[in-house]
Amino acid sequence: MRTSIYGHHPSFAKLPGKAGERDTYLDNAEQWVEDMFAGSKAGLKPLYRALLERGLSIAKDVQACPCRTIVPFYRHHVIAQIKPATRTRIDLGLALGDTKAPKRLIETGGFEKGDRITHRIEITALKDIDAEVMRWLKRAYALDA
């Protein structure tokens, strides 16, 4: 069985039970990430890689599970997600419940709708992935205890 995807950390969410299914998922997930950051969104790939690395560094039990349009981070449930929003911006979605948002943390309306992701931070440059982003990622992790 393969243990990494896209040259990154080998920690991915609870994969399907059978080895063949895991390998198929890993093949598909790698292609989904490639497709997500292809064409006009190719310039976002360094931001994605930095967010993935930092998200997985929060704790040993954090896992990522790429889908066709997002890359969610899990503990027990989704705690955050990487979403290429435009050709120049990634939205880092966060599961923060009814947390009151300071200016940089944008409410998504998700809490009122019962969605898991309730806030987002706009990421347009590597410098945007700073200590504040890490604090919010760690807060989302802690809320999923």
Residue ranges, per PLM feature:
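Charge-dense, helix-prone N-terminal extensions
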Residues: 1-145
